[in-house]
Amino acid sequence: MDKKILITGSTGFVGSNIIRSLLKKNVHIYDVLRSKNKNKIKIKKLRRNKNYSPIFYNKFYELQKKLKRIKIDIIINCATFYTKKNDIKNIEKLVQTNIIFCSVVLEILKNKIKKFINFGSMMEYSKGNRFSPENFYAVTKYSFQKVEEFYKLDNKNIKFYDLKLYETYGDNDQRKKIIPTIIKNYLLNKNIKIVSRNLEMNFVHIDSLTNVIEMIIFRKIKEGEYCIKNKKFIKIQKLINSLNKKLLKKIKVKYLSSYKIINSGKKLKNFPNFNDKKNLEEFLLKKINK
C-alpha cells in the first residue's frame, strides 16, 4: 500500500527537493500550503502528478477540517522561517512559523501518524555540547523539539526523528547562503564578502539529505536526534583558492576579518550509514563554468 506523507514548508529549498525525490517513489504526497501559493507555476506543475495533493488553507480551523478527512502515515516538517534579526516583527514570525504552525499540525494528526520527521539546526549548539543558541531562530527550533517531547508522553505510537543540519547546497538554490552567493556573484563579476579568512563550514548536498529522508520512510531506523554532516569541515579560503587555480576568471573575495570561528557544535549521533559522496568543489566548477 502507498505510504501517505504530509509535508510542510515545501516551497523552500529543502522541502521542494524532498517532494521532487519522493514523487519518484511509491508514495502519495499531501502538501500543506497557504492559499496564496495556489497559482504558483511550480504548484501547478506538481498538480499534474496523480500522487500529489495540495492542501490549501488560510486559517488553522480550515486546515484542521481538511486534515481530518485524510489518512496520513508520516509528517515531514520542513516549515521554517530564518532570520538573524531579533526585532519584534521577526520574533513574531519566527514563533508563528517554527513553533505554533508545526505544533498545530502535530496536534491535528497525532492520532494518525507513525513517524514525524523534523529539521533543526546546529545553530542550537553554537558553543559546545549544551544548548547555546546562536540566534532567536535557533531558540525556536530547540523549543519545538521540546513540544515534540510533550507529545511523546501520550503518543508512544509515533517515532520522532530530529535531524540537525549545518549547511545544505544543490541545484536551483535561491537562498542567501554562501554557496549560491559564490555562484551568483562570480557570474555577475561581483566581490564576495566572507566574514573571516578562517571560516570553516560543513556542507551536505541536498540529494544526500533526501536519501536520509527516504531511509527513514522506507527502512527501520531508530528514532532520535541525528546530525547530518559531512565527514570534513571545509575552510572557505582554501576552497576559493583551489577554485581560483582552475578558473580563468578568478573569484573576487574580500575577507572581513581573520577571526577564528570554532565549530564545536554538540556531538550528536551521526545518521546511520550516512555518506555524502558529492564533491563541493566539482559542483561549484560545474556551476560557474556554464
Task: Explain the meaning of each model-derived region.
Residues 136-138, 142, 146-201, 206-210, ...:
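NAD(P)-dependent short-chain dehydrogenase/reductase
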Residues 27-38:
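Conserved glycine-rich Rossmann-like NAD(P)H-binding loop of the short-chain dehydrogenase/reductase
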Residues 8, 72-78, 118, 227:
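Rossmann-fold scaffold of SDR-type NAD(P)-dependent oxidoreductases
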